[in-house]
């Protein structure tokens, strides 16, 4: 996943 939830940028 690209920019999903893990290393995406939500936090």
Swiss-Prot record:
GO terms for molecular function: chitin binding; endochitinase activity. Keywords: Allergen, Carbohydrate metabolism, Chitin degradation, Chitin-binding, Glycosidase, Hydrolase, Plant defense, Polysaccharide degradation. GO terms for biological process: chitin catabolic process; defense response; polysaccharide catabolic process. It is an enzyme of class 3 (hydrolase). Its EC number is 3.2.1.14. It catalyses: Random endo-hydrolysis of N-acetyl-beta-D-glucosaminide (1->4)-beta-linkages in chitin and chitodextrins. Hydrolyzes chitin and may play a role in defense against fungal pathogens containing chitin. Belongs to the glycosyl hydrolase 19 family. Chitinase class I subfamily. This is Endochitinase.
